[in-house]
Amino acid sequence: MEGTKKYISVGELEKHNQLGDVWISIQGKVYNVTDWIKKHPGGDVPIMNLAGQDATDAFIAYHPGTAWKNLENLFTGYHLEDYLVSEISKDYRKLASEFSKAGLFEKKGHTVIYCLSFIALLLCGCVYGVLCSNSLWVHMLSGAMLGMCFIQAAYLGHDSGHYTMMSSKGYNKFAQVLNGNCLTGISIAWWKWTHNAHHIACNSLDYDPDLQHLPVFAVPSSFFKSLTSRFYGRELTFDGLSRFLVSYQHFTIYLVMIFGRINLYVQTFLLLFSTRKVPDRALNIIGILVYWTWFPYLVSCLPNWNERVLFVLTCFSVTALQHIQFTLNHFAADVYVGPPTGTNWFEKQAAGTIDISCSSWMDWFFGGLQFQLEHHLFPRMPRCQLRNISPIVQDYCKKHNLPYRSLSFFDANVATIKTLRTAALQARDLTVVPQNLLWEAFNTHG
């Protein structure tokens, strides 16, 4: 009966936001997830970022209907006092329900078999070119094919991390490790750790790891005051070296993207051999060992060191296209400082994303991520459905006066460079005394 319900205020809920005492609210009911957070498949970071808050929209976005039954065991018996739902959230939940009833989350098409076949073809072509030809140009083409193989494998790894794209969870985990660890050398455990945090805290400067690139990049001037990364648990110091590198970031971004893959390799090893709890650590390490067995061996089959270096550079130059795409989706969008909030979750996703407009025949190249807002709103949606729901999302944003940015690949690059240039010029104009001799040498006048 209504009169027997127990209520707590929003202020009381907010007090339960520390490890060892974690409560969240979903559709007005309050749940104690203190112990569950240790078993949460998506890790502890997404829950901690929304601890002590209403997390309804985020829960709907990231969980299938079968997950709701798990909540009852976590129910505290309390309901949220004065629980209100904005019109934006009401419409979002209605959209999610309609898409679910239409079966869009289950209609996965033939993307997996097409992509796996394409990856196999690229890999076979690469190996054949390396082993069966003496031509430098064939070897460079082989490197490009391997780079495209890395891109397509990363897209499949991304898909498998968001939803079960295979016939079972066991096969899905195999696909994750195969495409992530074995084929690209990047741990799926590292990817899920950082990527889930990125989705929840999209474009939060101190909570979203995808924007924390000091000393190399700083998107807004907020980094110039030095921020504390809540994700990494350390200060992002804007020192003399950072000032120098950021001041030229609009010139260096594409070069950095070529070698950015090396950083991902390093991050993978740092996580897998850290003291942090890593799901399936042994399996991830085995997958990485597979990669670091076949990839160096393939490179060693080339006739000399000049060709080996050119092969790797060609390969990494192609994969740089994917790294660039990731920056286009977010760098020129709105940013903010502070934790994500569950009550305006949709608004933050819309403000922090940029779509890339392209013809449907190019969808394979972008892996569905050209529909960045659609993906952020419905991360469990198979990529083959994103183009279908795009007009509906556009109408939704128009109705609620929310931003819906869709730029061509060229225009998105221009917008990103302009954003980086603005921050670079601001970094040069800082009046603080340089602490880096390299900065002083490059900026000495007279």
From Swiss-Prot:
Binding-site positions, heme: H40, H63
Catalysis performed (reactions): an N-acyl-(4R)-4-hydroxysphinganine + 2 Fe(II)-[cytochrome b5] + O2 + 2 H(+) = a (4R,8E)-4-hydroxysphingenine ceramide + 2 Fe(III)-[cytochrome b5] + 2 H2O; an N-acyl-(4R)-4-hydroxysphinganine + 2 Fe(II)-[cytochrome b5] + O2 + 2 H(+) = a (4R,8Z)-4-hydroxysphing-8-enine ceramide + 2 Fe(III)-[cytochrome b5] + 2 H2O
Start and end residues of each Cytochrome b5 heme-binding domain: 5-89
Motif Histidine box-3 per UniProt: ranges: 372-376
Pfam families: Cyt-b5, FA_desaturase
Subcellular localization: Membrane
Alphabetical list of Gene3D superfamilies matching this protein: Cytochrome b5-like heme/steroid binding domain
Domain of life of the source: Eukaryota
UniProt-listed GO biological process terms: sphingolipid metabolic process
An annotated Gene Ontology molecular function: metal ion binding
PROSITE patterns: CYTOCHROME_B5_2 (PS50255)
EC identifiers of the protein: 1.14.19.29
Family under the similarity heading: Belongs to the fatty acid desaturase type 1 family.
Function summary: Plays a major role as delta(8)-fatty-acid desaturase which introduces a double bond at the 8-position in the long-chain base (LCB) of ceramides with or without a hydroxy group at the 4-position. The enzyme produces both the 8E and 8Z isomers (in a 4:1 ratio). This structural modification contributes to the quantitative partitioning of ceramides between the two major sphingolipid classes, glucosylceramides and glycosylinositolphosphoryl ceramides.
Name recorded for this polypeptide: Delta(8)-fatty-acid desaturase
Organism for this UniProt entry: Borago officinalis (Bourrache)
